[in-house]
Amino acid sequence: MNAQLLQPAFVDPVLDAQRGFRAALKALAEPGLIQHLPSAPHLDGLAPATYALCLALLDIDTPLWLAPSFDTPLIRANLAFHCGCPFTANREDAVFALLGEHDLLDLGGFDHGNDRYPDQSCTLLVQLTDLEAGRGLLWRGPGIKAQRQVHVLVPQAFWLERQRREAFPRGLDVLFAAGHHLIGLPRSSRVTEERA
């Protein structure tokens, strides 16, 4: 590992990791509500919220799959040093996957869990440019009273791919991040078109 590649992570590793973990939990418990991570650090190539999620969630027991756009020496060196996470080239071995919006068109190969242990599925950490610039979609499910309108900017093909692979309780949980913000989409949430 090249020490020149290493950049600072959390200022207060324990408290900041706890804040990041709680934000991720709250995002998945209240799908579609934007969570804010004001003290998230910066790493070139990763939005502050994306980097904070990695620092809070990844460790030696969580193999990470990197989409090609995130598979850089800088990102690898910092995640290996600060998180201790192993990297995998095989989607099926990943506990977490780091993707961009263009990587959402094919979710094949990621572990969707099984009926007995659905919690053993892969969690997708998806970096976007904006969490509020997409067309309005209605989210329903646990943690949402009636329905919630969400404007996450992802390709339409992602929603079709997600729906095609739906087999609750199996599925993929998703944390979308942009800037200092994140939104959770658990496998239990249903997404439909907004009706005029």
Feature locations, PLM:
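Internal, well-folded beta-alpha domain core
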Residues: 73-196
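N-terminal, charge-rich interaction modules
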Residues: 1-63, 67-70, 81-83, 179-181, ...
